[in-house]
UniProtKB/Swiss-Prot annotation:
Role according to the record: Plays a role in virus cell tropism, and may be required for efficient virus replication in macrophages.
Stated name of the protein: Protein MGF 300-2R
Family stated for the protein in its record: Belongs to the asfivirus MGF 300 family.
Source species: African swine fever virus (isolate Warthog/Namibia/Wart80/1980)
Length: 160
């Protein structure tokens, strides 16, 4: 079963141009760790496995572990979590020694914890519903409860 977090990432990759047209989207995505900076969503290159701004292979592909080190130095825990979920190697932590308070064990726990906070779940749901293309929205009914909205979003994203 795909998680709502994974469904959100899948939707962001597919419809990122439409979603990014809305000014408040950037701030919400930055807080959720789906954004590296204020201009680009993190995508994984399908050819070399490195991080890319477009998802396509180019000379600008960045090693995910370099981004992990930078995220740890900036103490961006949400970005660290996102990078680890995308396949970053937690053993690179030893390069930082005592510069931050995160230990190897804490990072391992981040990797194994696939849950997201309720506040973040609400933000993802409302953000995605508001940014969905009209074709998908027409097939969905606006739900009054958060549980109903989550269910509708998952059905929309996972439908063949």
């Amino acid at each position: 079963m795909i998680t709502l977090y994974e469904a959100a990432i899948k939707t962001l990759i597919t419809h990122r141009k439409q979603i990014l047209k809305h000014p408040d989207s950037r701030e919400i995505l930055l807080a959720l760790g789906l954004y590296w900076d204020k201009t680009h969503i993190l995508l994984k290159c399908h050819e070399c496995g490195k991080m890319s701004l477009t998802g396509k292979h180019s000379t600008k592909c960045i090693n995910i572990n370099c981004l992990l080190i930078l995220a740890i130095k900036k103490k961006n825990k949400r970005m660290v979590d996102t990078l680890i979920r995308m396949g970053a190697d937690v053993t690179y932590i030893h390069l930082l020694k005592n510069k931050i308070k995160l230990s190897y064990n804490q990072l391992s726990m981040l990797k194994s914890n696939s849950q997201i906070a309720l506040k973040e779940l609400h933000a993802i749901c409302y953000l995605l519903y508001g940014r969905l293309p009209k074709k998908i929205k027409q097939g969905m009914q606006l739900c009054k409860t958060m549980a109903g909205l989550c269910g509708e979003l998952l059905c929309a994203f996972l439908a063949p």
